[in-house]
């Protein structure tokens, strides 16, 4: 809700998928559906469906492995890279510039608060897992 509006037909998950694919590629991984599923902790059928949607819209391209034609890899198209650039890097660059007025003291306080919140959530999760 706080991000800039996406183009018609583009789901917020598309940006998350492309971010995940780029992160995996930077690690030297040739990305497959299973890699996205594992990295995002999502079920494979849902990932498969979203990847098909993104491919149909021109944001992703699937291609067969040269070594094993049964293996299919996924890459971001130029159109996908443009979308990712606009709604990721540009947005966060503008946001970073806007956050420049936050003092070091305020930033440290925020970090402590987030860390405390995370610790509480982890403890609650452990309690739920025991049930």
Question: What is the role of each PLM region?
Answer:
Residues 105-131:
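C-terminal regulatory/oligomerization modules of transcriptional regulators
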């Amino acid at each position: 809700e706080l991000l800039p509006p996406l183009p018609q037909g583009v789901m917020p998950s598309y940006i998350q998928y492309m971010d995940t694919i780029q992160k995996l590629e930077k690690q030297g991984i040739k990305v497959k559906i299973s890699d996205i599923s594992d990295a995002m902790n999502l079920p494979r059928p849902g990932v498969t469906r979203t990847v098909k949607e993104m491919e149909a819209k021109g944001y992703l391209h699937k291609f067969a492995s040269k070594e094993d034609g049964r293996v299919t890899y996924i890459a971001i198209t130029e159109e996908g890279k443009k979308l990712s650039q606009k709604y990721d890097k540009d947005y966060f660059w503008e946001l970073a510039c806007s956050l420049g007025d936050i003092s070091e003291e305020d930033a440290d306080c925020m970090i402590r608060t987030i860390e405390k919140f995370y610790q509480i959530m982890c403890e609650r999760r452990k309690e739920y897992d025991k049930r």
